Structures are given as structure tokens and as C-alpha cells.
């Protein structure tokens, strides 16, 4: 059993048990899990199917989001110099992952294939909306690498 309270997802966050030294190990582990989930999702073993993609990505990204949300909440309401340092150290890593997730051309191609498949017409409304949002919010990597002409 993991003793890091940021890695315990069976109940509400145990805010009082969370210390600054828990942040980096938890976020690093959850980022590794989320990165691995992304690689699995875009690989050949996961069909271009909403449920298949969701099964691979949702758990990992939800766990990361839940842990990071807890850290962010504590940073807002019970900040200490140590927690602020842990938050500031991990913020770029979490941001970089979400940027990569939203700009991954391989994932975008899978989502486009899902949207183009006949099964997408049978998706429940919330899933159709989530799929439409994923396609709408995709940002090509080239947006981040081009220098603005000023």
C-alpha cells in the first residue's frame, strides 16, 4: 500500500496528511503513468474507438488531475513556503504534459478516426460532446514551435 496521500484515490483527499514532500514523488509517478497511457492510446493495440481510448486515457489523466487539483487547492488555501516551492517545481511538468496531450498529432488522428467512424453516431450525447471538444481543442505542435513575426 502506498503511504503517499496524494496517491490514495479511494476516498476524498486527506488534506491534513499531505505534506510538501509528498508532491514531487506523487506527481512524477502520475506523470509517468499518464505518459505511458498516452503512448498506449496512440499505439496500434488501441482501436480508434471512443470507449477504447477512454479506457486507456481517462484513469491516468483523472488521477493526475485529482492529485494536482489537491495540490493546487492546498497551495491556494493553506500555503507554506515548502508547499509553494513544491507547487512551483511541479507546475511546469504538469503544464508540459497537458500541452503535449492537447497537441499530440497521433492522438488527434485517433480522435478524428473515431469521429469519422459509423459508431460515433451511436455515442451518447455526453461522449459526443467530449469527442467534439477534444477535436475542437487540439492545438498543433507547430503553434508552439513557430516564432511570431513582430
Where are these regions (language model features)?
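Zn2+-dependent metallopeptidase catalytic domains
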Residues: 1-150
Amino acid at each position: 500500500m502506498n503511504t503517499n496521500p496524494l496517491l490514495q484515490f479511494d476516498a476524498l483527499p486527506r488534506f491534513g496528511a499531505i505534506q510538501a514532500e509528498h508532491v514531487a514523488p506523487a506527481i512524477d509517478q502520475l506523470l509517468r503513468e499518464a505518459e505511458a497511457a498516452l503512448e498506449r492510446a496512440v499505439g496500434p493495440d488501441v482501436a480508434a474507438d471512443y470507449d477504447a481510448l477512454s479506457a486507456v486515457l481517462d484513469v491516468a489523466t483523472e488521477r493526475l488531475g485529482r492529485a494536482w487539483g489537491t495540490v493546487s487547492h492546498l497551495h491556494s488555501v493553506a500555503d507554506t513556503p515548502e508547499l509553494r516551492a513544491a507547487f512551483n517545481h511541479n507546475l511546469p511538468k504538469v503544464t508540459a504534459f497537458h500541452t503535449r496531450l492537447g497537441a499530440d498529432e497521433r492522438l488527434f488522428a485517433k480522435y478524428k478516426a473515431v469521429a469519422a467512424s459509423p459508431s460515433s453516431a451511436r455515442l451518447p450525447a455526453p461522449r459526443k460532446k467530449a469527442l467534439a471538444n477534444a477535436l475542437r481543442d487540439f492545438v498543433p505542435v507547430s503553434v508552439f514551435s513557430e516564432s511570431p513575426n513582430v
